[in-house]
């Protein structure tokens, strides 16, 4: 990136094929898209998912600068390396990043946009639950079982894995001998209600200039996206299509990856140029 930060990415497919960029949510990594990226590649898409700065295997910002404008600049840089304008799929924080970047380049950055369980204005109770989890456990975990218990408490509707070894993709062993989440703890800072309102208004004001196709996919059990938030976005983005994934909460791709893939299939067929491809 322009400030020297290196971003880790996973790619499937070949350059020159219909391009798709996938952005994970806050506290997640590119591995949250693992199944979708692999499937897209087998169907002839050039799919790329990368760890946001301060997450996963990507570098941490020295300053630190983790504003949405900074994340949007990173996305713009990645998109500029693709052979053609991509479809951008963003979950939660990734969706907010996509809206900021596309709002700055409403007709040239992306071919289409998919928002995953996010809108400019979200349910404050659901947002607090997410933030409490992301800002909790600052002292880390003694072992994988303790980390798995924390995740199970946050996602009670999802079965607790019998073997928690997969969590190691999201954990790092630090000098204190404890396991800590992979992200830079400076990334998640509490924002005031006034700051969140200014951010929501800024995004909503950008929306009328966005003319590309757009899809919002939300989890039927989500406590983050509300009916009011969806309708407010749709009023500013009239081309917005809306799809629901039954049995999924805020973390749709992790809760129901098969159903999520099915929800985006028709949209990608129409706007990424692969007639007849099915993601299942």
Model-derived regions: residue spans:
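A short loop-to-beta-strand scaffold at the N-terminal edge of the catalytic core in hydrolase folds
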Residues: 3-12
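Conserved HGGG/HGGXW glycine-rich cap/lid loop of the alpha/beta-hydrolase fold
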Residues: 11-57
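Glycine-rich "HGGG/HGxG" loop immediately N-terminal to the catalytic nucleophile
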Residues: 31, 52-68, 124
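Conserved acidic catalytic loop of the alpha/beta-hydrolase fold
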Residues: 70-86
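Conserved hydrolase catalytic core segment
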Residues: 84-124
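Conserved alpha/beta-hydrolase catalytic His-Asp/Glu region
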Residues: 142-198
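Conserved serine/cysteine hydrolase catalytic core
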Residues: 175-236, 241-244
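Catalytic histidine-centered segment of alpha/beta-hydrolase-like enzymes
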Residues: 248-261
């Amino acid at each position: 990136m322009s400030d020297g930060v290196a971003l880790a990415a996973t790619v499937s497919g070949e350059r020159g094929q219909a391009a798709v960029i996938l952005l994970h949510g806050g506290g997640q990594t590119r591995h949250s898209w693992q199944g979708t990226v692999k499937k897209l590649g087998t169907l002839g898409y050039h799919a790329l998912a990368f760890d946001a700065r301060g997450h996963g295997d990507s570098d941490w910002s020295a300053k630190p600068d983790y504003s949405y404008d900074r994340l949007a600049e990173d996305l713009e840089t990645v998109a500029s390396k693709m052979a053609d304008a991509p479809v951008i799929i963003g979950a939660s924080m990734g969706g907010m990043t996509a809206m900021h970047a596309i709002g700055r380049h409403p007709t040239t950055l992306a071919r289409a946009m998919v928002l995953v369980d996010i809108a400019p204005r979200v349910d404050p109770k659901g947002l607090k639950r997410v933030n409490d989890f992301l800002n909790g456990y600052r002292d880390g975990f003694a072992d994988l079982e303790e980390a798995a218990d924390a995740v199970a408490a946050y996602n009670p509707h999802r079965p607790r894995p019998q073997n928690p070894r997969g969590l190691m993709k999201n954990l790092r062993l630090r000098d204190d001998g404890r396991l800590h989440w992979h992200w830079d703890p400076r990334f998640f800072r509490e924002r005031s209600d006034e700051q969140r309102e200014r951010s929501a208004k800024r995004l909503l004001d950008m929306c009328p200039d966005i003319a590309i196709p757009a899809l919002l996919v939300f989890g039927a059990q989500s406590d983050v996206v509300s009916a009011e938030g969806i309708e407010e976005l749709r009023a500013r983005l009239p081309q917005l299509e809306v799809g629901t994934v039954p049995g999924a909460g805020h973390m749709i791709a992790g809760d129901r990856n098969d159903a999520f893939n099915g929800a985006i299939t028709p949209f990608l067929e129409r706007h990424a140029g692969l007639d007849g491809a099915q993601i299942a």
